[in-house]
Amino acid sequence: MLKLIIDAQRWRNHLTAFAKSCPGIVPVTKGNGYGFGHELLVQESQRLGIDILAVGVAQEVASVRQYGWDKDVIVLNPWRPGDEVAAGLLNDPKVITTISRREDIAALRDLAPSASILVEVETSMHRHGVPADEVAALDLDGFDLRGWTIHLPSGASLDEGREMARIVKQHPLASRGIWFSHLSCDDYIALSKKLDVPVRMRVGTRLWLGAVSYTHLRA
């Protein structure tokens, strides 16, 4: 059985430096917590003064809360009708639900008309998201809209980030903020200075596993 051995102090120094260099990050704690487990990642997020965690699926909300996380949690996997666990969290004001299809907005309004949501916009990844030509006309009245989420491909360019922001800003509620992923810290900061809306960045691998020289495997 392999064990992951960590130089804890150097790893924590990396986390602190990363958080300072990219203010406003939203750490991702999905799955098994990048091999560290949810308990440790919750503890480190609290130490860093983080205000929002991201989990992959609705079932993981209970796990981070079990270890003491009592602030906001965003569920990255887009909501779909029929997910009973996700439906049970819709009226929790500290759980932010991701919406990625126009038809799901209508379905969600029937279940939880004041739910806290992020709206995902389709990018060049073409994985999830509301198509660009549908964004401006989305009816989000009544929801607690926390912002718009832009899942860019790995190594995304600043140009695509700018273009996605332009699309979002066509909506009357664009001022709620834009959440990006996979921008470099420099590009993220540059974009946040250019936009007149709040900007956040989700980050997982680069935060938790970015200091690979401080870890090794032992049998």
Region roles according to the model:
Residues 11-14, 18:
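Alpha-helical packing segments of well-folded alpha/beta enzyme cores
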Residues 18, 82, 132-133, 174, ...:
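General structural signal for secondary-structure boundaries
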Residues 152-214:
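Catalytic alpha/beta core domains of metabolic enzymes, predominantly
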Residues 215-219:
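Conserved small/polar residues in nucleotide/adenosyl-binding loops
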